[in-house]
């Protein structure tokens, strides 16, 4: 049996009422086909676009036992992450993110 425990620490403390919409937390896991450090460089270069879309990055990191598997946790207004990922699919793929491996879990605040 595999037991997974996830503790989310509020690293981003914007008040929901400041955003004016329902907030969503995205837990995105996927595989990469480049070294993690290369993927991370691409990801960090995308930060201005994420910031412009009011998407907060709460966490990003490789799986402890397999650096080709990555998890990113994001918080944003409803639908904003979907819009960002659709608009930037080619840039995301260039980073080494294997798009067809993506698993997204969305939680409401």
Named regions from a protein language model:
Residues 2-91, 97, 102-109:
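Short S/T/G/P-rich N-terminal loop/turn motif that feeds into the first structured element of a domain
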């Amino acid at each position: 049996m595999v037991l997974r425990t996830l503790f989310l620490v509020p690293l981003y403390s914007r008040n929901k009422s400041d955003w004016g919409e329902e907030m969503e937390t995205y837990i995105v896991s996927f595989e990469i086909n480049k070294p993690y450090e290369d993927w991370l460089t691409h990801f960090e270069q995308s930060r201005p676009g994420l910031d412009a879309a009011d998407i907060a990055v709460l966490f990003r990191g490789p799986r402890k036992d397999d650096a080709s598997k990555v998890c990113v946790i994001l918080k944003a207004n409803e639908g904003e992450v979907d819009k960002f990922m659709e608009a930037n699919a080619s840039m995301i793929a260039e980073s080494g993110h294997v798009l067809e491996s993506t698993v997204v879990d969305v939680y409401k605040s």
